[in-house]
């Protein structure tokens, strides 16, 4: 499960971090979070769909940047004006096309270059591992802020920037 490159991996981790922040901001302590891999019920597609929605919300909220997102009910909303007989077939074909565009092309969670279904599933394994690393931790209101600092220090210091001669300056 090789990652395409270290800079890409770092950017994907930042995208996941944005998702985690949005999810924590929107949820109270007793709510079920969306930033998690639900073993037994989730697919790579359902996980990535939730992450895409959270990322869109985060980019709009924190960066004031609009992100294109295709919701699951996009096809139904698009073709409501068609007759029932033709609409079912049209929705099926449109859904399949959108699914391919949405999941089998590079995106904000592509740790690997994704341009087909096989690569999507390879990337999905990596994405699940990354989500599972973070899902049990709380970023907002956490007394363990040092853990987050240590994590980013390790990411920056031990791989992502050393190849370019750039180093992270540790906190005293």
Regions found by a protein language model. Name each.
Residues 2-13, 140-144:
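Structural motif
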Residues 3, 151, 162-164:
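Generic hydrophobic/packing signal
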Residues 7-25:
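Core catalytic lobe of class I
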Residues 18, 25-160:
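Long recognition/docking surfaces used for binding and targeting
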Residues 163-172:
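Conserved SAM-binding loop and adjacent beta-strand
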